[in-house]
Amino acid sequence: MIMDNFDSPFQYNRPEMTVEAIKKSIVYKLIFLIGRSPREASQRDWLNATLHAVRDLVTEGWITTARQTRAEDSRRVYYLSMEFLIGRTLSNAMIAEGIYGLAQEALSELNVDLEEVLEKEVDPGLGNGGLGRLAACFMDSIATLGLPGMGYGIRYEYGMFRQKIENGQQVERPDAWLEKGAPWEFIRPSKRFTVEFGGNIHFEGKKCIWQDTEKVTALAYDQMIPGYQNNSAATLRLWSAHAGEVFNLADFNRGEHLAALEEHSANKNLSRVLYPDDSTWNGRELRLRQEYFLVSASLQDILRRHKRTHNSLENLADKVAIHLNDTHPALAIPELMRILVDDEGFEWKKAWEMTRNIFSYTCHTLMSEALETWPVEMMAKILPRHLQMIFEINDHFLEYVRTYVTTDNDFIRRVSLIEEGYQRKVRMGWLSVVGSHKINGVAEIHSDLMVTSTFADFARIFPERFTNVTNGITPRRWLAVANPQLAALFDKYIGSEWRCDLSQIEKLKPFAQEKAFKEAVADIKFANKVKLAEYVKSELGVELDPHALFDVQVKRIHEYKRQMLNVLHIIARYNEMLTNPEKDWQPRVFILAGKAASAYYAAKQTIHLINDVANVINNDERLKGRLKVVFIPNYSVSLAQLIIPAADISEQISLAGTEASGTSNMKFALNGALTLGTLDGANVEILENVGEDNIFIFGNTVEQVEQLRREGYRSFEYYQNDAQLRTVVDQIIEGKFSPEDPQRYHQLLQGLQYHDYYQAFADFRSYVETQKAVDEKYKQRDQWIESTIQNIVNMGFFSSDRTIKEYAERIWKVEPVQLGD
């Protein structure tokens, strides 16, 4: 079809959504873009050709969205995040465009299996955990709601790392996700900006001059994020680092070849790896440079876009909202101030008012170690002007506090942006609060704790700034893509509106007692368990019984997430099964996955212990296959899409008061897993929505945790007073699970015996008893299926569409673009 209304007077052939048109497009891309004959093409060639063909279908809506946003002169939101864990793009895009079945049929006519092709796509290495996946869900919702929004991140060449398990231990390998090509992205050669580091500053009157800097070039790559069947797409712009000059030609011509290329290589390091090891000073410096690289390039682009439309920055705060996803992009606050004051000539107080009205900030943690701080000495070397600007902001802020709040020196010391001490530090969480007009927590309990603990002093100063926006997940990715059989069942019963309005899923409630519906849900769950078992058998060589209860904990490995508590229970169960072999034990499969930060010794030791325990249990014939433990390496979005639909139990067992929200709890519940968890994060709201009969809650509450700390928590007393716990701990310490190295876990377990900051020992007994209740309920098949369905049908609140609507209305003040058909 020739179209001329989209870009008149230019004519073009609009891609058609028919089997024949898609088939022709794929073959055309294969021959003329990939350069392969259909007779010789590999599955990866077919993947890339299909990606290009589907990309064509998304592109027109993407361009139309951008054009309409400009035409309406809409206020726009820009979402800054160090991570965007977007997952595979092809299946998501085909569902968004409504062509999954058409593409499947088109490829089938070419004797190509779509499912096999999809498995060839590599997950983009753009994130690690929940922070990045949340950002990806948010971008999906921004596109689906037609909001004028754009994401900014870094195009990491090697991601975080590819996790291998060798001799039970995590080994980090480069995640070379780009080596097979990235057909979904558009390189933007004209969108390149200079990012400056180092140098020195001096004042000429009131004007600050930043000079003699080291320069790096940021080059843009765009990813389209398609909205769900609305002919719209949002932009995720990712920055790649390049040398300011390709290399020093003068050095090269003098024969100093390595010196000439050294700077080039060092500058490219800024976008090589997500979260470089920060256990060294150099690693910390690289991470600080990365964060500034992101915000500098992004702000230059944002201001360029604004000036293109308005020719002035006077109305910047009226037309631009910038959101900080955690503290990583917090340098955007002093960077915007620097640009407005130094480059654009704004008066300081006006620039500060504009800045505060532009920025908003999501706090994702209550743990002080996760709220970034940077040594003043380091920032003075790398970003001298920004450190000076932070000092100015701090002086202005503390003057306000003394004038309008209190002159108490202890209070002023606590809220200062600069932490005084042996090593002075810049508090990035504090900077984010002071420089933003809204600060939100991500679950009700988290937001309450945020204003009563972490940011209590700031809530006294700025009570109107703090709010809650509970996290959500996109049902397109986490049901339609991850669990297509279940999605099709829901379509059959209530239509497909739930895909873009998850509250519609409650329409399934009348069918919750219907035998045919219950059996269909149970059959789909079993089929998903079979699929996961086949993967584990193929990849790990471990045989799993899909009739067993699949108990799953998949998330970043961290002490506060308490994978150790899970392991302690697994060993306790193992001991009981050997003591009482004739008991009618519910068969269980414990599935764990997640990465440990490369420098996080305790987390890496936990992975080693899990694998040692798995090795002993899986090879103990006395268990007769009734207990299995598997650690699945290299957890990713794609693996999550395989694991989550197969889970019966979702382990959400962080210490109460430590998990801000969590979103895997929502994904599991939406796919019919029952939550086993503490009263932490979004577990509290899941409990409120699904009802206490359909969730397993254990452990101390936030208040009880704090009371234990106040009174002096002594973990060794729990060890002494609980015989079962004592046996388990002694077995690990004595080397039962590491006979070749009996001392292996001494340090790890002694840390629990004498410190146990996250109170695993305190919650152990409650956890073990609750696990027994899980067994009993699972044996009542009909009751279990009813609870499965109750979890699903009561998850309507936990959509990222609802979350983003709240951000748009209450924080960003942006409205949807009026999109045509």
Swiss-Prot record:
Quick check: keyword Glycosyltransferase in the entry?
A: yes
Pfam families in alphabetical order: Phosphorylase
**Catalytic activity of the protein:** [(1->4)-alpha-D-glucosyl](n) + phosphate = [(1->4)-alpha-D-glucosyl](n-1) + alpha-D-glucose 1-phosphate
Recorded GO molecular functions are: glycogen phosphorylase activity; pyridoxal phosphate binding
Keywords recorded for this protein, A-Z: Allosteric enzyme, Carbohydrate metabolism, Glycogen metabolism, Glycosyltransferase, Pyridoxal phosphate, Transferase
Top-rank lineage group of the source organism: Bacteria
* The protein's Enzyme Commission number: 2.4.1.1
Entry keyword annotation includes Hydrolase: no
Q: Which cellular components does GO assign to this protein?
A: cytoplasm
**InterPro entries the UniProt entry points to:** Glycg_phsphrylas, Glyco_trans_35, Pyridoxal_P_attach_site
Biological process terms from the Gene Ontology for this record are: glycogen catabolic process
Cofactor(s) needed? pyridoxal 5'-phosphate
List where this protein forms a coiled coil.
none
Which residues, renumbered to this chain, carry the PTM N6-(pyridoxal phosphate)lysine?
K667
The family assignment reads: Belongs to the glycogen phosphorylase family.
- Chain's role: Phosphorylase is an important allosteric enzyme in carbohydrate metabolism. Enzymes from different sources differ in their regulatory mechanisms and in their natural substrates. However, all known phosphorylases share catalytic and structural properties.
Q: What is this protein called?
A: Glycogen phosphorylase
The organism's taxonomy opens as:
Bacteria, Pseudomonadati, Pseudomonadota, Gammaproteobacteria, Pasteurellales
